[in-house]
Amino acid sequence: MWSILSIKRSTSRMELMCLNAAECPINVFPEQQRNMPTESLNPGTVLIVGGGPVGLITATTLAKYGVRSVILERNLTTTKWPKMDLTNSRSMEIYQRLGIADALRNVAVPSHYPFTCLFSSGLHADKAITAWDLPSPDEYRRRIREQNDGSMPSEPWLRVSQEIFEAWLKELGMENPLIDFRAGWKVKGARELDHGVEVEAIHSDTGEVWKVSADFVIGCDGAHSAIRKSLEIPLDGGPIHGYAVLVHFKSRDLSRIQKQGQFWHLFFPNAASDGGSIKGAVIAQDEVDTWTVHRFMRPDVDHTQLSSEEIVYDLLGGMGGQPFPIRIDEVLVRSTWTPSVALARSYAGPKHRIFIAGDACHQTVPTGGYGMNTGIADGYDIGWKLAAVIQGWAGPATLLSYEKERRPVGELALQWSKVHMGNLMKMSAELGLDAHMIELNNETGAELRGAMHSYLQTHDGHNQSIGVEMGYRYVSNICVPGALDAELSPPEFHPRKYTPCTMPGYRAPHVYLTTGTPVSRLFGDGFTLVAFPEGEGLNASTEQLREAARKKALPLEVVELPGEMHAHEVWGASLVLVRPDGFVSWHGDSVRSQEEADRIIAQASGFDSEHLGNHVQAQERSAL
């Protein structure tokens, strides 16, 4: 049975926007389905379709702001597939904001292990040909503290398999009284109405069909999203030529697997004569006994004729084709997957009652680790924005900003995942890698190995593209330009760099203060006004912005940092208005009047009618 949740409804502008879903028209689904059991979620409760990591992070974000959610998840258990194995620094910053980062590190790969990536011609050789020596989280954190110039994230990255992460995150969700997780319910479709959404769901065991009404729905239901299909949103892009076999297994035969050294990823190129490209990779999931092999196959190869053990041995043998056997204690799972690069043309329904996030709106190849991490940022973004609207301290433009801000980021992730994959895939043919010559102990062999080393050290952005992860700029109606912006030019985008900048739409730079505290730890749950009171007249500006926020019932934390000259220099403005997600809404050195302060706060919170557009104004009129 469906549980009925209750929530206190704020007396706010949301009473004009989020009408009881029970008021929505009933006859949405076909005639024969009109008599199906129906549940109307209480006003302010968000329905999330898909209980994987993106759906759970979305629910966790909503819960942080006191907003209830119901998750419909078709699977009865969490994933057994390793999938994601890198949590990048931007995701860790999000988890820190949600209060779960430290607990996640406790279940992840211990933080002293480096992220070494080896490139090998095969384990028959004594040594790998080259390596990307990427730092451990401990080393990364040390570098962040030492550098302290605003160009680094506030949190180092993390190694954790999705198999572990999803189970851990689901347990947190099940313990949260504001999250109602319902397993075994497959959503068949959704209808977006003027004042809500109707969703049809079927139980996987009983076949029972229910209709659920909610004010808002977020589709986190993967690449084959029923929610996206219900909205008839097309995908641009699709599968890439070829496929891969995944073998996830247990083995303590470390002396053979790690013959060429400890690694996080171990890559094997194909010989140029064997079609070039990458033969596959091994991922060390826990530095104990859990490994994942990805073996890329030509479309004409039938993998079912090979055992899982044969696939592993063949990959470890490298480009020479001679298998390298190891002791496999247990094969956990095996599957095939096809690389896909695709982007949804829209992230929301036309009435902005339905939104999609994660793989439902973007699919990337694994290179760079952008897929899951981009989805996590999607869920966090729509989570805080929807919570703010439901609670009345943000207006309609806030919901419009989700697609405007997040879709370009999805496009950026797709672009660079293809660049990284392309660099790996074309290496063998470009260098003319030869399985016999590459291991020769002579000048020819040394030259070929040297060429491969040089190529890979030049094309090493695979996991070092911090600009792609957090150096982008949001451009939307809730980013407020000011007088200071006329004097400045935005930093040039570079995939390998994050240039600190507090122009509207950029992530607020991380800096340690003189107390040793990261400035981001002082941010409130709502908006934060960071003030560097070094000059005269700043108190008046601060009070005007505080008063403007009070009039809009906008939660605003004012953080005054006198004497923090270094942080002030990095941030480049005396006043910076920071959103709940750590991105900048507005910056300036002063506010000239209360009227200007009111305008800044109104636009930043999505209430400024001049920046809504005719579509949203029409929606508001219909809601009235």
From Swiss-Prot:
Keyword Transcription regulation part of the UniProt annotation: no
Cofactors named for this entry: FAD
GO biological processes: biosynthetic process
Keyword annotations: FAD, Flavoprotein, Monooxygenase, Oxidoreductase
Molecular function per GO: FAD binding; oxidoreductase activity; oxidoreductase activity, acting on paired donors, with incorporation or reduction of molecular oxygen, NAD(P)H as one donor, and incorporation of one atom of oxygen
SUPFAM superfamilies: FAD/NAD(P)-binding domain
Enzyme Commission code(s) on record: 1.-.-.-
Binding positions (FAD): E73, D359
Top EC class for this record: oxidoreductase
This protein's record includes keyword Oxidoreductase: yes
Stretches assigned to coiled coil: none
Domain of life: Eukaryota
InterPro entries for the chain: FAD-bd (IPR002938), FAD/NAD-bd_sf (IPR036188), RIFMO-like (IPR050641)
Function in brief: FAD-dependent monooxygenase; part of the gene cluster that mediates the biosynthesis of aspyridones. The polyketide-amino acid backbone preaspyridone A is first assembled by the PKS-NRPS hybrid apdA. The assembly of preaspyridone A is initiated by loading of malonyl-CoA onto apdA, followed by decarboxylation to yield the acetyl starter unit. The growing polyketide chain then elongates into a tetraketide. The adpA PKS module catalyzes three Claisen condensations, as well as beta-keto processing and methylation.
Family, as annotated: Belongs to the paxM FAD-dependent monooxygenase family.
Name of this chain's protein: FAD-dependent monooxygenase apdD
Species the sequence originates in: Emericella nidulans (strain FGSC A4 / ATCC 38163 / CBS 112.46 / NRRL 194 / M139) (Aspergillus nidulans)
